[in-house]
């Protein structure tokens, strides 16, 4: 018989650097999950992607066991890395903070394709371009 799901917790943690401090500790502690076990497994699973923020969806079961699925990093994080900027523009329509090539946008769209609800790579690219525009990044 399948285990009964108690909760689904969504978090965004730095790859390979999850620790029991907030936000991980309080989010999982209230469901009775072994926080250190999660941190250890998450850090092993994301060690190769160090420096990126990785969204994770943790499914907590009735017996306090858990499973988790890691997603691709948010488009905004990938765009900031590609443009070589620290923060996005506060006024994106007036002040541009960086430039990203169409080839780089396509690369990001291909990486994120499985997490986006886009039918084609072109549609995924348009979504990524929209994110870039709202951050003040020019597409060249």
UniProtKB/Swiss-Prot annotation:
GO biological process terms held by the UniProt record: translation
The organism sits in which domain of life? Bacteria
In terms of SUPFAM superfamilies, this protein maps to: Ribosomal L11/L12e N-terminal domain, Ribosomal protein L11, C-terminal domain
Could you confirm whether the keyword RNA-binding appears in this record?
Answer: yes
Q: Coiled-coil region(s) at which residues?
A: none
The molecular function terms of the Gene Ontology recorded here are: large ribosomal subunit rRNA binding; structural constituent of ribosome
The family line of this record is: Belongs to the universal ribosomal protein uL11 family.
Q: Which PANTHER family match?
A: 60S RIBOSOMAL PROTEIN L12, LARGE RIBOSOMAL SUBUNIT PROTEIN UL11M
Which protein is depicted?
Answer: Large ribosomal subunit protein uL11
Gene (UniProt): rplK
């Amino acid at each position: 018989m399948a285990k009964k799901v108690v909760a689904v917790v969504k978090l965004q943690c730095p790859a390979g650097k999850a620790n029991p401090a907030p936000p991980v500790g309080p989010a999982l502690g209230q469901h009775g999950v072994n926080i250190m076990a999660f941190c250890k497994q998450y850090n092993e699973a994301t060690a190769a992607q160090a420096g990126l923020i990785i969204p994770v969806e943790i499914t907590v079961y009735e017996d306090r066991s858990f499973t988790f699925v890691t997603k691709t990093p948010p488009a905004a994080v990938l765009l900031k890395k590609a443009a070589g900027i620290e923060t996005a523009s506060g006024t994106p329509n007036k002040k541009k903070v960086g430039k990203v090539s169409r080839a780089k946008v396509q690369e990001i769209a291909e990486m994120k394709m499985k997490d986006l609800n886009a039918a084609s790579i072109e549609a995924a690219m348009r979504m990524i371009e929209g994110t870039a525009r709202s951050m003040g990044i020019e597409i060249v």
